[in-house]
């Protein structure tokens, strides 16, 4: 592999293949952006940026470019109006894909399932707090 991507706070393992070699040492060109386990090659993204990971064994050397990206999370829309007894589904995009959690500010007005399905209970407004990748978004639901 000549390049790889890892997200901030996440780890990945990229193995260097040096012909006929069993003992390889790994090094990062900038440990403020990404660290690498010198024996296993497991990299961890520290902050957004690009580094060169070098694998060496004796006189043999291989390098690859590692890009560290900040995780992203967004909602396709931030509000909806529904009738009492009806539902709407909160749709989101996350990179990397991760567990999304939903919490209703007022369960007497609107409830939300673990899959993001919001149900109108009675007239009013509720804010659904949606979290993923350490990022929080708000979805306002108005029940008519």
Residue ranges and their predicted role:
Residues 1-144:
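Extracytoplasmic soluble-region selector
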């Amino acid at each position: 592999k000549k390049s790889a991507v890892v997200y901030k706070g996440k780890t990945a393992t990229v193995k260097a293949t040096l012909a006929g070699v069993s003992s390889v040492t790994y090094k990062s060109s900038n440990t403020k952006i990404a660290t690498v386990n010198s024996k296993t090659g497991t990299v961890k993204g520290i902050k957004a940026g690009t580094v060169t990971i070098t694998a060496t064994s004796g006189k043999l050397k291989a390098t690859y470019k590692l890009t560290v990206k900040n995780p992203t999370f967004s909602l396709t829309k931030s509000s909806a109006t529904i009738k009492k007894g009806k539902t709407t589904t909160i749709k989101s995009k996350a990179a990397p894909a991760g567990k999304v959690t939903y919490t209703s500010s007022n369960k007497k007005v609107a409830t939300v399932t673990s899959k993001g399905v919001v149900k109108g209970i009675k007239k009013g407004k509720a804010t659904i707090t949606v979290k993923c990748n350490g990022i929080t978004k708000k979805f306002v639901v108005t029940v008519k």
